[in-house]
Amino acid sequence: YSIGNKNIFKRDGKKYIISPYALMLEDQNYYLLGYDTNDKKFKHYRVDKIIGIEATTEPLDGQEEFKEINLPKYSKKFFSMFGGNVEKIKLQVDSDLIGVITDRFGKNIIIKKINDNNFEVIVEIAVSPQFYGWVTSFSGKIKIISPENTVTDFKNHLKKVAEFYK
């Protein structure tokens, strides 16, 4: 949307060709999980922002790829359904947040106790600014340990935010 509350379309208003597979609820919004035929990958589309839908008789693209997706596990990788490179991230977490971690990533994760105050967990996450915002929302109680490129990106993200407030 523009400041005048008018629609501004991505891709110069060109139509998307999407094979729809699932609806997911995240942060009180429904998202369509669809296979983008042009980009040859799954993407998320907020349902209330979709306009001008047309059905085709073309077969669904991405059927083999969709068979590999476990929807509950898949959705836990994304923060506010924003995409990003999916990576295995090691986090050091304050023990008080065990419930937060299991709520977010499920109970089938491996948790390693470090000491009475902290534990480590490795989770698959789509790294994005929204993920970084989630980490910072716990005021230093969650630390990204690895991979090193994600730690560096997070530090750069924090520097940009700090610079904005100088």
Question: What are the language-model segments listed below?
Answer:
Residues 1-80, 86-90:
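Core beta-strand-centered patch of the WYL/Sm-like small regulatory domain
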Residues 71-166:
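Polybasic (Lys/Arg-rich)
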